[in-house]
């Protein structure tokens, strides 16, 4: 409560300052750019990072590429295409993560009124850790999408045993990827939503909604901040709190069917939550 009260005080001070800014001033221009990209999160980010620095880390465009995305690519170029690399060297968390994901998925697929088991899409797939252990045992075919070609090349070796069920590998950043219309029973998005701006996450979730078959669902699994929004400078990602995340989900035209906190992770870890989402057209 103390944090939220301090944030609202900060919000009021900033909005008053913003109202008084010259519409042609540098501060107004930078603020407008950040607010456009992080409309749900930007005031939390401005609490911790000065305006000019935040702009340089996120919304500034250099050589046609937004720095928030360019810096993430640089980070992942140094990540090895291994399970350890996919888990950020916390390989001991892979097993409880997989077990919880398998259990959560079973609640929403198979049977009347549930998602089918024909085709799934693994978003931000990396080498295919989730595909191998969670999706391929359930679905007739799986597709992978990731921005790193090196990860997708390794995925073909990593998934070799079940490779005949892998329909295709898409080398795209998620902000540039559009799932084919009504193709998937399940779209799995894990530990990658924080690499999208608020604007692009909202748009991507909307496109994923259109990519679902009848009764199809989206599984969103990610770190959820306890309060506000946190920018990780090391990998250029944001961790949003529950209110911010659910607001973006709602605005994308999706409804939360169920949510569950990941068990078995150390207390000092940022909480991880799983959400099952479907189109509000089915509500």
Curated annotation (Swiss-Prot):
Belongs to the methyltransferase superfamily. NTM1 family. This is N-terminal Xaa-Pro-Lys N-methyltransferase 2. Pfam families: Methyltransf_PK. It is found in: Nucleus. S-adenosyl-L-methionine binds at residues 124, 129, 146, 174-175, 190, 195. GO terms for biological process: N-terminal protein amino acid methylation. Alpha N-methyltransferase that methylates the N-terminus of target proteins containing the N-terminal motif [Ala/Pro/Ser]-Pro-Lys when the initiator Met is cleaved. Specifically catalyzes monomethylation of exposed alpha-amino group of Ala or Ser residue in the [Ala/Ser]-Pro-Lys motif and Pro in the Pro-Pro-Lys motif. Predominantly functions as a mono-methyltransferase but is also able to di-/tri-methylate the GPKRIA peptide and di-methylate the PPKRIA peptide (in vitro). May activate NTMT1 by priming its substrates for trimethylation. SUPFAM superfamilies: S-adenosyl-L-methionine-dependent methyltransferases. Keywords: Methyltransferase, Nucleus, S-adenosyl-L-methionine, Transferase. Its EC number is 2.1.1.299. The keyword Transferase applies. One of its GO terms (cellular component) is nucleus. The lineage of its organism: Eukaryota, Metazoa, Chordata, Craniata, Vertebrata. One of its GO terms (molecular function) is N-terminal protein N-methyltransferase activity. It catalyses: N-terminal L-alanyl-L-prolyl-L-lysyl-[protein] + S-adenosyl-L-methionine = N-terminal N-methyl-L-alanyl-L-prolyl-L-lysyl-[protein] + S-adenosyl-L-homocysteine + H(+); N-terminal L-prolyl-L-prolyl-L-lysyl-[protein] + S-adenosyl-L-methionine = N-terminal N-methyl-L-prolyl-L-prolyl-L-lysyl-[protein] + S-adenosyl-L-homocysteine + H(+); N-terminal L-seryl-L-prolyl-L-lysyl-[protein] + S-adenosyl-L-methionine = N-terminal N-methyl-L-seryl-L-prolyl-L-lysyl-[protein] + S-adenosyl-L-homocysteine + H(+). The keyword Nucleotidyltransferase does not apply. It comes from the Eukaryota.
